[in-house]
């Protein structure tokens, strides 16, 4: 199922300035619940929800998505799916680093309908890859929620959008798997006059990480 929009429950600025954010982001689950309770006071919209709720999570570190998913489950008829884990780290926080990040997931995802949960939506590649993982295991992802986001909440691209991107960059499939690209990634790509400029910027970013 194609998801056009991500739903945002609060905002990034408020989240990162919470007194609970640092410890929650570093892996303290109690702090993560305190953060969620501070930022989201009404879960009534989820009352009739009956599906799996799967957070973006690693085996250590940031517990905010897990806490948000847990609160949604507590206030609905949904079931928490906490058996899927992100296995690799993003190479950096710059947009260029996010462009070439390929998230890898592992774990058990029961067959059924899902909503996905993350703390912040930036490019959407982490959520997109989680969606792909769940769907490859027979699940059906119907929606996604985050606390905060970047400028856009648009998520998956239309066939027309992908066709226009390929017309702009005929060799783009040498660099990216088009169906995996999100709207935010596509809009970033369209800023470049050529793919070689994009690749050069990425190479420079990786060089700086290695030597500075």
Which residues fall in each region the model found?
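Active-site-facing substrate-recognition patch
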Residues: 1-48, 89-108, 183-191, 200
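Short, highly selective alpha-helical patches that border small-molecule cofactor pockets
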Residues: 61, 65-73, 127
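PRPP-dependent phosphoribosyltransferase catalytic core
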Residues: 5-8, 131-212
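A short, structured active-site edge motif that brings together acidic residues
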Residues: 80-91
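Short glycine-rich phosphate-binding loop at a beta-alpha junction
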Residues: 46-60
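Short coil/turn segments at beta-strand junctions that form active-site/ligand-binding loops
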Residues: 47-50, 111-113, 140
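A contiguous pocket-lining binding segment that forms or flanks enzyme active sites
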Residues: 112-136
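Structural alpha-beta junctions
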Residues: 73-82, 135-142
């Amino acid at each position: 199922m194609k998801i056009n929009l991500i739903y945002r429950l609060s905002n990034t600025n408020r989240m990162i300035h919470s007194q609970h954010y640092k410890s929650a982001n570093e892996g303290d689950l109690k702090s993560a619940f305190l953060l969620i309770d501070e930022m989201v006071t009404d879960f009534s919209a989820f009352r009739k929800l009956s599906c799996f709720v799967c957070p973006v999570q690693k085996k250590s570190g940031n517990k905010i998505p897990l806490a948000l998913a847990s609160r949604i489950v507590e206030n609905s008829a949904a079931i928490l799916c906490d058996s899927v884990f992100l296995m690799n780290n993003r190479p950096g926080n710059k947009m260029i680093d996010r462009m070439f990040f390929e998230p890898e997931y592992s774990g058990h995802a029961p067959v059924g309908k899902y909503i996905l949960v993350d703390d912040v939506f930036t490019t959407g590649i982490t959520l997109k890859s989680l969606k792909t993982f769940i769907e490859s295991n027979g699940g059906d992802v119907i929606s996604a929620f985050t606390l905060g986001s970047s400028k856009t909440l648009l998520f998956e691209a239309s066939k027309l959008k992908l066709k226009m991107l390929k017309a702009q960059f005929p060799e783009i499939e040498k660099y990216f798997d088009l169906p995996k690209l999100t709207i935010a990634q596509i809009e970033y790509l369209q800023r470049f006059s050529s793919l070689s400029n994009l690749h050069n910027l990425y190479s420079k970013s990786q060089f700086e990480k290695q030597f500075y």
